[in-house]
Amino acid sequence: MASKIETLKANLEAALGARVVSLTEAIGELTLVVKASDYLEVAKTLRDDPKLRFEQLIDLCGIDYQTYGDGAYDGPRFAAVSQLLSVTNNWRLRLRVFAPDDDLPIVPSLVDTWSSSNWYEREAFDLYGLVFEGHPDLRRLLTDYGFIGHPFRKDFPVSGYVEMRYDPEEKRVVYQPVTIEPREITPRVIREDRYGGLKH
């Protein structure tokens, strides 16, 4: 008798055929990689096929592969990864799609297939700059309105570009370039035998 993973793998290969770029198993879960051009069609098949029935998208995130692994990675830079759940069959599936263009990463939106992807896609847009084509309200979710850049990209500086502070003269919050002053930290060495009442 085939295991659940083997049954799911066979059902995916039968339903999707040549649209499967890769299908791998890791840590007891399958990862399905598809092309951006097939992404929407595959998502609808995963949801509607009676042998698959992935009714829920439970998570979606962006990934920046710029410095992936040992630095020898040569594939596309950005991907969107969805975690799917079939309540009917008690299956989970990781669906990954790579954006074909690294300079302007665009992938189709899954909002019409799974409405739960709405805010997840907004978060991935905000933090990674992934543009979800067809999204009804693609705007920033976590960063400030005037924020420049996408903070989870690997080429974004850790300190950021600007900092905000309250200006008492203008009586409002203002932005200014980041000011990080280098400082030397000298460890404090205590040489007293009974410092702070401690007994040795």
From Swiss-Prot:
Q: Which reaction does it catalyse?
A: a quinone + NADH + 5 H(+)(in) = a quinol + NAD(+) + 4 H(+)(out)
Question: Record's superkingdom?
Answer: Bacteria
Indicate the principal place this protein occupies in or around the cell. Answer: membrane
Q: Which GO terms describe its cellular component?
A: plasma membrane
Q: Report the PROSITE patterns cross-referenced here.
A: COMPLEX1_30K
Disulfide connectivity for this sequence is: none
Q: Which Pfam families match?
A: Complex1_30kDa (PF00329)
Similarity comment text for this entry: Belongs to the complex I 30 kDa subunit family.
The record's subunit annotation is: NDH-1 is composed of 14 different subunits. Subunits NuoB, C, D, E, F, and G constitute the peripheral sector of the complex.
Query: What's its job?
Result: NDH-1 shuttles electrons from NADH, via FMN and iron-sulfur (Fe-S) centers, to quinones in the respiratory chain. The immediate electron acceptor for the enzyme in this species is believed to be ubiquinone. Couples the redox reaction to proton translocation (for every two electrons transferred, four hydrogen ions are translocated across the cytoplasmic membrane), and thus conserves the redox energy in a proton gradient.
Q: What is this protein called?
A: NADH-quinone oxidoreductase subunit C
Species annotation: Burkholderia vietnamiensis (strain G4 / LMG 22486) (Burkholderia cepacia (strain R1808))
The encoding gene is nuoC
